[in-house]
Amino acid sequence: TSARVKELLLLEQNSGLYSKETYDKFKERVRESKFKLLELLRSIKREGKRIIAIGAPAKGSTLLNYCSIGPDMIDYVAERSTFKIGRYTPGTHIPIVDEARIFEDQPDYGLLLSWNIADIIIPKLKEKGFNGKFIIPVPTAHVV
């Protein structure tokens, strides 16, 4: 192997990537994140509030499935892509509808499934007239 490959392998080793403990800690952080999200969503539902999801990326489906979040918790997923509208989220079977619906319905909360671009999505939806609050699911679920 080249010197660069050896350097990268050493960096990985020094970063703990070959240690079971690293992955055990990661697993616990992921579990904790899941429980905090579910706790937040359940408390919102107990208040009688409506929650929808915003965006239908693949990572959003992973989150919904891992947390067992379905149509009992999320009314629908608002999406811009015409390819996805009229379909359902894989595994959790939440209907995917045109994003325009959120401006008519004005649900209380929108769970951002494209949380990595929240800083782009939130201002655009507010500018278009969405009055609800936003739930950022990870790394720690919180409302903005």
Residue ranges: model-predicted function:
Residues 62-75:
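Substrate-recognition/cap helix-loop segment adjacent to the acidic, metal-dependent catalytic center
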